Amino acid sequence: MRQTLVLDVVGLTPALLAHAPNLKALAAAGGLRPLTTVLPAVTTTVQSTFVTGLLPRDHGIVGNGWYFRDLAEVWLWRQSNRLVQGEKLWE
């Protein structure tokens, strides 16, 4: 079986690889493929789409924060796989 490494570095563009020689060498030895994003193009939404193959409307993660009505507060970066609906690629 061929092994695959997926390295998800938020905000890393091919132009920035010049400043990261080890990552550039890793990409050159293996491969580098562009990805198109989903909207909203924020970290938790995009990563949830990446690991489930589902659109935000289907996995339920539509931003980096969650509004809790009972507290009337937005909490940012609530990170838990339980928040993402849909089967993850490692399941």
What are these regions (language model features)?
Residues V6:
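Hydrophobic "anchor" residues on beta-strands that sit immediately upstream
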